[in-house]
Amino acid sequence: MSNTATRLTSHPEEAAVRVPLELYMRGHAEDSAEHMRAAFMPTARLESVREGPLTSWDLDTYCQRFNNTPAADEATRRRTIDTLDIVGTAASAKVTLVHGSITFTDYFVLLKTAQGWKIANKAFHAQVA
């Protein structure tokens, strides 16, 4: 599901920063709002420009898209953590999700909170092959 074995930085927090990203990818794989809620801060926004207008969801709206029914083609889907940049209590990450003919490129801002690293915001683009 992810490239968890490949270190992208020498930062001592890398493993901890990966936790919410891997929860996010697992949430997609299992179609699980529970995993998404564990990955994101409750105040997170998820945004993209799709076919012109801005799409902007709060976490509750985003989680309504998940109903614990993995996609029929789940076995063929790929998800990778491509880049990580970590400085102090802030980080950014790029994740690629290949879901059939659609490739999603996700950019995340993460923060180290009292509950550990969490995704603060996500901006994404969907490209149809």
Give the ranges of each region predicted by the language model.
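Short beta-strand segments enriched in hydrophobic/aromatic residues
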Residues: 40, 97-99, 123-124
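Short beta-strand edge/turn micro-motifs at domain boundaries
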Residues: 103-129
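Amphipathic, hydrophobic secondary-structure cores in small proteins
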Residues: 27, 98-99, 108
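Generic alpha-helical hydrophobic packing signal
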Residues: 17-18, 37, 89-91, 117
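Residue-level signal for alpha-helical context at structural boundaries
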Residues: 10, 35, 39-42, 53-55, ...
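Terminal "cap-and-tail" regions of soluble proteins that handle hydrophobic small molecules
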Residues: 2-5, 57, 118
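Short, low-complexity N-terminal intrinsically disordered segments enriched in polar/charged residues
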Residues: 1-34, 38-42
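Surface-exposed, charged secondary-structure patches
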Residues: 12-16, 45-103
